[in-house]
């Protein structure tokens, strides 16, 4: 599952402004999709990467579950054609990452790449 804690950390540390989400089409068969939004270790909740890596050795992911879209999206060519659940999923990931998700792929072919902000 998508680990929003680690992605947010990587985006901050590396000064990212945008992300790409690939293989969104692969999730189309799932009734629900989980996103790791925090970790729990020894009764403490971590919503950011802990200062000491050793915490991860015993940490358990805390997931938020979103509804899946359960349909084929491989023919979608722009963000607005995606099912509402897929758009909500991307928006949720973007909010957690703290940066834009500007590229989304819905298959292996070049024309299956959606540039969300290009007009």
What are these regions (language model features)?
Residues 1-119:
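Non-transmembrane, aqueous-exposed alpha-helical and coiled segments at domain scale
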């Amino acid at each position: 599952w998508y680990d929003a804690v680690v992605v947010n950390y990587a985006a901050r540390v590396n000064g990212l402004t945008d992300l790409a989400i690939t293989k969104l089409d692969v999730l189309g068969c799932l009734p629900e999709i989980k996103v790791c939004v925090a970790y729990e270790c020894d009764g403490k909740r971590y919503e950011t990467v802990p200062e000491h890596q050793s915490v991860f050795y015993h940490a358990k992911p805390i997931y938020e579950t979103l509804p899946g879209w359960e349909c084929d999206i491989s023919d979608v060519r722009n963000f607005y054609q995606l099912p509402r659940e897929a758009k909500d999923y991307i928006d949720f990931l973007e909010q957690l990452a703290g940066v834009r998700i500007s590229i989304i792929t819905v298959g292996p072919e070049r024309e299956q790449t959606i540039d969300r902000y290009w007009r």
